[in-house]
Amino acid sequence: MKKILLVVIVAVIALYAFKRMVVEPYLWKKAINTPEHQLQMGSFIFSQQRGHNGSQSMENQYFIFKVTEIQGDFVRLAVIRKLSAGDQIVQGDFSTTKKAYGELKGNIKSVVITGISRNDLYGRRTGRDPHQIDEYLLQKYPALKTSRYYFEDVPDKTRPVPQDPMDRMEYFSLVYSKKAIIEHGRLVAWILNNRPEPELSNRVETIDLILN
């Protein structure tokens, strides 16, 4: 009986390893070459990640990104969020809810998502919540009346990598490796690790889906 149980356990482990190492990479490479799922400007990337929930425990976190810039191996992503209305906080961080994540996977092509400049979000009056809708944003971005989903838009999508250290730190925020996305279906960030030149992070996040 113990031998049979051991054989079953080994078989399950082998099947799981085969699925992760052979089947999933094959399906990813097949999908990434189709027009609906290939990486390009404007693509939406869905990713489930493990993160801290504010205490010592971990939880699943759900992220939706929009590709706003591609330069060589640098792929800049912007987080899709929903502006809060009134005193109701929709999202306290960059992740979204499991329910919204599932819904947007099915209908994101029909949802109005507005690109808002960084200055309009953060560069105005002090004491204002940058993630809360107000009359200024409604006047400048009328599409927000239809849907409060938005992303932080990049005004200059062809700017070179800056030389100033502080500007470089800001530049490499949410910049990921194009090769890792296409070849492995992974989000691997480019970071400045106390060095003048960027390097790839050791942290790897899995991509669920790319949609165009």
Predicted regions located by residue number:
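Mixed-charge, low-complexity intrinsically disordered regions
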Residues: 2-63, 74-212
